Every structure is written in C-alpha cells, then in structure tokens.
C-alpha cells in the first residue's frame, strides 16, 4: 500500500530536468537520476508538495492533485532496473554506491509487486490505515501561498476517487480470502467513525496561521469551501468505505496470522525483507532475536537484586518537566557520541487531538528540501507518558536529536543525487532511531546508571521477544499459549490479558515493530563487527557518523557503506 505522507524520514529532495526519462536516448547517469526523480514527483502530488516549495524551478509539472493510487503501481520498476543496469560498468566511486542503493530499492519493489502478493496488504490496518494517512496528510498540509489553499480544497475533493479505489481493493481482497478479521474490522471502523464529521478538518484549517497575507473574509470563505469539499467528497468516500467494511467483515479467513493464508508465509518473509532491505531468512532473523534475548535476560538475572529493584520501583524522574527542556538537554549532550550539526531551528507544537492516540508521545515532521523552514516536533499533550519520565526522554531522542531530526538534517547536507532522497527503508530509519535511544538512557539526568542499565536491558529483551512472537505468529502459527510460554522462558511472566493484548496487536499489524526492533538488531550487529575489525581505533562517534554518511540505505548495504566511511 502507498504511504501517503512519510512523516518519519527521507522521502524528499530537489532536482531539475525534463519530466520523463529519455529511455531511447542515453543520457549521463546523473541526468538519468534527475529525470526519474522528476517522474516520481510528478506522479505523486503529496510527496512533491511536502518535499518542495518551488517545484517549478526544477521543471516539475503538477499533473494531478490527488491522494494517488491505492496500489501504487504507476511506475515500471522492471524497466527502471533495466535502464539502471545499462550504466553499471561505467560507474565508479560514489556513483557505484548510488547505483547499488537504487538497484536494491527497485528490486525490492518488483519483488513485492508479484501478482501472488496482490491484495495481501491490509489497507485498513488500525495502526496505519489509508484513511488515517489521508487525515494526516490533510492535517500536515503546508500552505506557502494562497494557491496552496485552492490545491488543498482540490485534494479534499479528490478524496472520493481515492476511497472508491479502496472499496474496489477491499472487494477484491474479500474475494481472494485476504480480508481482515471481524475484530480488526471493528477496530478500524471505530477510528473511521471519528473522521466522519467535518469538525476535525474545518477546525484544523481555521486554526492555521499563514505566512502570506490573507484577509479574515477570505479565510472564512476558504473555511466554508473546505467544509463543502468534505461534505461533497470526503464524507461520501468514507461512507462508501464503511459500507464496504461492514459488507465484507465476516468473509475473513485471517483469524490466526498470515501463516494460515495462501502464500502467507512467503508474503510475510518477503515483506519483512523488503522493509529492512535484506536477504536474510526469517530463521536468521530469529537467531539475532534469540541472541539479544539471552544477552539481555542474562544481564538482568545477574544484576538485579532487592536493592536495585527498590530503586527501579521508586520515582525515576529526569527532572525535565517540559518537552522543550528535554530536547534542549539532548542538544547539550549528543555531541559526546555524534558529530555536531550546525544550529538546528526547531519548534514544538501540539498534535491535532482528532488524529492523536494517547499512546503516541511525539513525531517528527520532515521539512522541505528547497526551503529553510523550521523543523517541527509534534507532541501529544494528552499522552499517557509523563514528561519527566525516562520513556519520554528516550522517545524524544528517537524523534529529535540524535534521532530522526538529526538523520534528516544530516542527509540534507550530503548533496547526493536527488532521487536517493526518495529511498525509504524503514528498517534503516527506525532501526537507527531506536538505536539512538540507547544513548538517551546514557544521557538521561538524575537517574542512577545502574537503574538505567537494567531498564535498558529490559527494553532490549522486549525488542527480542516481540520479534520472536511476531515471527512465531505469522510464520509458525503460534497460539496465545505459545506466546505466553515464549515470554515465560525468559522470566517475563505475562497475564493472560496481557498476552491477549500483545497477540491481537501483532495479529492486526504484522509488521508494525519490525523496522524498529529488527532494524536495531542489525545495526547493533554491524557495530559489534566494526568494534572487532577496528579494535582500539573504533570510536562511537566515528561509527555513528558512518551510519548516517550515506542517508537512507537498505540494511544489506549498510555494513559496506559503514566500512567505507570508517576506513577513509
């Protein structure tokens, strides 16, 4: 399924050239890369708009204002691979790296476009549904001038066409036996119902402030137009989707994980591999998770005693009682282990509560690549996490410094060919941001180091057990009893209620934690290998610089790019 708006990392960049790749006339490698970037931007209005303030400067023509295509099959990746391969023998240096990254990216796309996997993606996943993505795209839409308001209204008006595509997809999904379970359908409908009123959209627009001149009368008129567009298009579209889900909700054959479906095991493995950008089998991934589980469990068992347990259960406050003070603290400390970036302008703003989950503390909104606007961290004032907690500190490290905000700003200064900024391996992006949370545990003030070490080991153990449970459910047909036994084997005794909640979450969203926890494990393995390879010459700062030195890359290539960077 197409991700309408990537809020996490690296889907953006700038370019100029002609609007279609000139396949019949051989151009230079860099010209070709610029051409396919333009093609991608012209085929994806939302990515183009969120990436560029002035697309016209790069000869990018807006073809259609819309949410795109549900199946995201408007690009011939096999043709791209063939054209890319025609340049292979002439490349050297950095161009070889660029070639490898793009070649792997398009190979993974071709693999997932296999007809046998068609209609297996759950576009109504309660944790990442297409309707929630539509809402997020509208709530985060950027207004640089009055024409953007007009385009915003056109985008809303296009919503019904996108929803009709979704309805056709759901119908076919039901016919193929891949429709979500009735329980997941009910969860999805709860979130959809929240969007079936214009208030969230209209109130969000009315709260906007604009950097350009707009009279109160005009803003009020545009607010009325937004409401009319919602009532004319978006609401009827959502209604069609709701009717389709109600119609097909009892046709599901997916009550016990993907392993029970035709091609389910193959799809699960292929999808995990494509999220990470690796060729490793699920068995090899399980080995990584088992190793981390054993290491973490052994540490906990050998270090936890009554005195330390008491300290852990006591109040563990960082003393930082605002989100701003947390980020300021991180900005002062991260330079111990990460290369300093020039001053990063950022602002903290509240999430729109119409689209916020109480379990979500914060997220990072990527700025454009041809502008100098402020980085934005959205925070949830109604989060269940206390602002002065270690969890809040590590989450903000994940989203800001030295996590996604650092990632994005470092990548932007690399000046690579533009198309490389459309590469988005979540296994790398989220694996890196999860990896830097280890440093957050190190940096967090006012909490004893032995407490932080135990709590971090518990986090690592949970990473491993979640991955083992995920693979167990969707590849090995684990029951709830199997999952409970797995956790008990590592002295994590969950109640049946806790097991049911965990099991259902992984059943509903098979890939949700994969990029975070498996990505983390791969990065830690690369770090271990580099420590062994370099010995006394190894430093965390050099390794962390090497991790971001090539931007977003498939993990299969990450170790070689890290080696190249650290051995220069």
Predicted regions and their residues:
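C-terminal motif of bacterial Sec signal peptides marking the signal peptidase cleavage site
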Residues: 15-16
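Repetitive helical segments and hydrophobic/amphipathic motifs
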Residues: 11-12
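N-terminal maturation segment of proteins
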Residues: 20-568
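Positively charged n-region of N-terminal signal peptides that target proteins for export
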Residues: 1-4
């Amino acid at each position: 399924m197409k991700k309408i708006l990537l809020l996490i990392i690296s889907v953006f960049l700038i370019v100029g050239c002609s609007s279609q790749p000139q396949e019949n006339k051989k151009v230079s490698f860099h010209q070709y890369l610029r051409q396919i970037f333009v093609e991608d931007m012209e085929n994806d209005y939302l990515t183009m708009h969120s990436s560029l303030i002035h697309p016209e400067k790069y000869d990018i023509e807006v073809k259609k204002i819309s949410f795109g295509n549900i199946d995201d099959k408007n690009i011939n990746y096999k043709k791209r691979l063939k054209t890319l391969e025609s340049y292979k023998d002439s490349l050297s240096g950095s161009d070889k790296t660029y070639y490898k990254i793009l070649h792997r990216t398009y190979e993974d796309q071709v693999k997932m476009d296999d007809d046998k996997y068609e209609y297996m993606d759950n576009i109504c996943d309660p944790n990442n549904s297409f309707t929630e993505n539509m809402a997020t795209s509208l709530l985060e839409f950027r207004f640089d001038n009055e024409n953007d308001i007009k385009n915003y209204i056109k985008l809303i008006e296009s919503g019904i066409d996108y929803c009709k595509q979704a309805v056709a997809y759901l119908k076919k999904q039901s016919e193929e036996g891949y429709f979500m379970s009735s329980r997941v359908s009910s969860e999805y409908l709860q979130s959809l119902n929240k969007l079936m009123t214009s208030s969230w959209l209209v109130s969000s627009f009315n709260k906007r402030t604009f950097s350009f001149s707009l009279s109160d009368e005009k803003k009020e008129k545009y607010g009325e137009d937004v409401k009319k567009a919602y009532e004319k298009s978006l609401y009827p579209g959502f209604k069609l989707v709701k009717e389709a889900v109600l119609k097909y909700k009892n046709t599901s054959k997916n009550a016990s994980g993907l392993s029970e479906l035709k091609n389910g095991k193959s799809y699960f493995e292929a999808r995990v591999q494509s999220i990470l950008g690796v060729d490793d089998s699920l068995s090899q991934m399980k080995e990584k998770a088992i190793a981390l589980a054993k290491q973490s469990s052994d540490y906990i068992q050998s270090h936890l005693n009554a005195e330390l347990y008491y300290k852990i259960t006591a109040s563990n406050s960082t003393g930082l009682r605002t989100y701003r003070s947390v980020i300021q603290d991180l900005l002062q400390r991260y330079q111990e282990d990460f290369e300093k970036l020039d001053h990063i302008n950022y602002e903290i703003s509240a999430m729109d509560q119409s689209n916020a989950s109480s379990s979500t503390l914060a997220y990072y909104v990527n700025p454009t690549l041809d502008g100098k606007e402020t980085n934005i961290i959205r925070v949830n004032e109604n989060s269940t996490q206390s602002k002065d907690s270690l969890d809040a500190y590590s989450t903000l490290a994940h989203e800001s410094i030295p996590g996604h905000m650092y990632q994005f700003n470092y990548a932007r200064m690399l000046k690579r060919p533009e198309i490389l900024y459309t590469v988005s391996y979540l296994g790398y992006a989220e694996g890196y941001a999860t990896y830097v949370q280890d440093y957050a545990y190190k940096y967090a003030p006012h909490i004893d180091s032995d407490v932080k070490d135990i709590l971090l080991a518990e986090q690592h153990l949970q990473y491993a057990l979640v991955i083992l449970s995920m693979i167990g459910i969707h590849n090995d047909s684990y029951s709830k009893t199997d999952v409970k036994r797995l956790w008990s084997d590592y002295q994590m005794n969950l109640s049946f209620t806790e097991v049911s909640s965990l099991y259902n979450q992984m059943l509903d969203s098979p890939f949700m934690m994969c990029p975070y926890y498996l990505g983390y494990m791969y990065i830690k393995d690369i770090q271990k290998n580099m420590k062994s390879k370099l010995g006394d010459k190894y430093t965390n700062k050099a390794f962390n610089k090497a991790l971001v030195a090539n931007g977003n890359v498939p993990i299969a290539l990450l170790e070689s790019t890290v080696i190249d960077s650290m051995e220069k």
